[in-house]
Amino acid sequence: MGFFPFVFPFAELEVGQHLYWQLGNLRIHGQVFMTSWIVIGALLALVVIGTKKMERDPRGVQNLLEFLWDYIRDLARTQIGEKVYRDWMPFIGTLFLFIFVSNWGGALVPWRLIHLPSGELGAPTADINTTVALALLVSLSYFYAGLSNKGLRYFEYYVHPTPIMLPFKIVEDFTKPLSLSFRLFGNILADELVVAVLVFLVPLVLPVPVMFLGLFTSAIQALIFATLAAYYIGEAVEEHH
Amino acid sequence: MDSITTAASVVAAGLAVGLGAIGPGIGQGSAAQGAVEGIARQPEAEGKIRGTLLLSFAFMESLTIYGLVVALVLLFANPFAG
């Protein structure tokens, strides 16, 4: 694998090289686990600190958390609908915050100062395994949402306007996780690659605007992933008449 | 990995991104046109239009990104590299 070991003097760009951990019969990508644990830890710490001493007039971290809560609630409510959005708000919020903090953490934290035996630390979402796992979770949850809300009537959705739609709707169930995972993975990896290549060509000043563009795209991608997840769930629980 | 596979992979990777950029390029152009017309007609709706425009841009962009993923697979994780 990886017949182009791109090793540049300034930006060590290593695509397809990982720090492998052996877990039973599984070979897992250690660097992804380390960064995602750091992201999860940071999020947990933020939430614990923010809710420790809650006040009537929110200040500081509590204020930030309440803003996030409002934001996620609005997102979930517009996509899923007034009736069941409460059940799915934690899931949508977790997806959004995890992806957002992963993307920004990969771009903002100078991971390259920490040397690993092979591979490099970076955004966990720049690994296809992470994004596929998240996308499959979304698939499972919209099936669960549909079945638990409507029972077997959920499958009416497949033949909803006409039975001609049946094959397309079945194919859609496979393309949804595929496009969700590829979109996130491709965007984040592309950001990292563009920055690394630019740093290689012009090490000074020029990469900075591209880095800002990357931050912007990463934030939008987190929003898109959460919005689409909410939309799919909303589509599954929607009542047809 | 023989040289003919390498050459074919590199050419295919270039084509995957290049051809994949055509459609979304046209699409983003016409979406931006619509947004600019909308803002010119109704400047107070600029915030809403901008939000929707950026979201739809990201959707169109992801089509090119699919091409990029194929290109990256060909370059870094080529399944035909013997």
Curated annotation (Swiss-Prot), chain B:
Q: Which HAMAP family match?
A: ATP_synth_c_bact
Taxonomy of the source species: Bacteria, Bacillati, Cyanobacteriota, Cyanophyceae, Synechococcales
Give the CC-aspect GO terms. plasma membrane-derived thylakoid membrane; proton-transporting ATP synthase complex; proton-transporting two-sector ATPase complex, proton-transporting domain
Instruction: Report whether Coiled coil shows up as a keyword of the record.
Output: no
Record has 4Fe-4S as a keyword: no
Q: How does it assemble?
A: F-type ATPases have 2 components, F(1) - the catalytic core - and F(0) - the membrane proton channel. F(1) has five subunits: alpha(3), beta(3), gamma(1), delta(1), epsilon(1). F(0) has four main subunits: a(1), b(1), b'(1) and c(10-14). The alpha and beta chains form an alternating ring which encloses part of the gamma chain. F(1) is attached to F(0) by a central stalk formed by the gamma and epsilon chains, while a peripheral stalk is formed by the delta, b and b' chains.
The coding gene here is atpE
Its keywords, alphabetically, are: ATP synthesis, CF(0), Hydrogen ion transport, Ion transport, Lipid-binding, Membrane, Thylakoid, Transmembrane, Transmembrane helix, Transport
Protein name, as recorded:
ATP synthase subunit c
> Where exactly are the transmembrane stretches of this chain?
7-27, 57-77
Superkingdom of source? Bacteria
GO terms (molecular function) for this protein are:
lipid binding; proton-transporting ATP synthase activity, rotational mechanism
- Give the protein family: Belongs to the ATPase C chain family.
SUPFAM superfamilies hit by this protein: F1F0 ATP synthase subunit C (SSF81333)
